[in-house]
Amino acid sequence: MADKADWQQPGLLHRAFDAAVTGDPYPVRAYISMRHNILSSLPDPDTLRSKLDKLDLIVAITTTWSPTADYADIVLPLSPALSRESILASKLGLKPQFFRRQRAVQPRFDTRADWEILCGLASRLGLDKLAFSRIEDIWNYQLEGTGLGIEAFDATGFVPLAPAPRWKTLAEATLPTPSGKIEARSRLWAASGHDTLPPYTAPERPAAPDQFRVIPGRAALHTQASTTNNPLLSELAPTNTLWIHTERSQALGIADGDWVEVCTATGPVGRLRAKVTTGIHPEAVFMLHGFGRKTPQETRAFGKGVADEACMVSGLEHEDPLGGGLALQKHFVTIRKAEETN
C-alpha cells in the first residue's frame, strides 16, 4: 500500500470514510472524485452522507450531474470521452499493448480533459514536475526508456508489445498460491484467523408476507448510474420497475403495471410500477440500478423510479471479511400496493 496501511486497510473506499469519522488509521480531510458517483454506487447513501459531512472538502470531476456532484463543494467539468485526450494506457493479456486516445471533437462549455485538470492543480500546488501543459509532453514522458516514439501510435492508435499472443503451457500455468493450484481452503488465510471453507449457513429469509430480498441489477442500455439522464437513453429506458413473482403479487393484490411502494425498516423509499413475472424467485424482488434520482439538475431522470442503494440500510457494514466487498443482496424491503397518480 502506498499509504503504508496494513492488510486490514486494503484501500477499500468505503473504509476511507470511516477514517474521516474516527481518524483511524489516520485522518481523512478531503475527497476528490474522478468520474465516481459514490452516493449512487455505494449502499445506504444517508449514512454515507453523514460520514462525508466530516470532510473539509469534496471535489467532483465529472462529465454529468449526479448526487455526488450536487453534494460536492466544487465541481470541475470534465470533457466527454470524444472531446478529450488521455494519457497512454496499457492493455494486458496474451498480447499486451500500449494505446492512445486522441480528441475527436473540440470540447464545449469550458470543460477540460482529466490531464488538464490534474496538471492545472499540480501547477497551483507547486508540483512543477507534474504540471504539463501539453498532452504530447505527457506522452513523451511516459515513453521514456521504452524505445518508442509517439509516432508509433499514428497508424492504429496502439502499439503491440509482443509479436504474437503468448500461450502458457499447462506446466507454466501456476497460480500465486503456496501450492500453485486453486485452494478451496487457504492456509495463509487460516494463519490470520479466517476460515475460507466454513460450514454452510442458510441465508436469512423474508420474515413477513410482504417482505422480500431486494436484488439490484444492470441493463444493457445504461452504464451503471451515469446515463439515466442521457437525452437519448432516457427515452429508451426512462425508469425502473419492480420485478415481483406472480404468486406473491397475487397474495398482495398487485397486478402487472400497478404502482407499488417500497419501504425499508426506516420508512418509505419510493414508488415504481410492478412487473409481475414468473422469472424471479418468489422471495426476491428486482430493480435496475441508477434510478430514483433526486438531483434537480438531472431534469430527465429526476423523481423517476426507486434507488436500489437507498434500500440497503446499514449496507456499509455488510462487508466480506476476506475479499472486502460489500454484500448488495443482503437487504430486505416490504412491498405494498400504492394509489394511482396522475
Question: Can you say where each PLM-predicted feature lies in the sequence?
Answer:
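Extended redox/cofactor-interaction regions of prokaryotic respiratory oxidoreductases
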Residues: 1-70, 80-88, 156-252
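Short, charged helix-to-loop "capping" segments that act as catalytic/coupling loops
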Residues: 24-25, 91-93, 265-269
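Catalytic, metal-anchored helix/loop core of enzyme active sites in primary metabolism
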Residues: 73
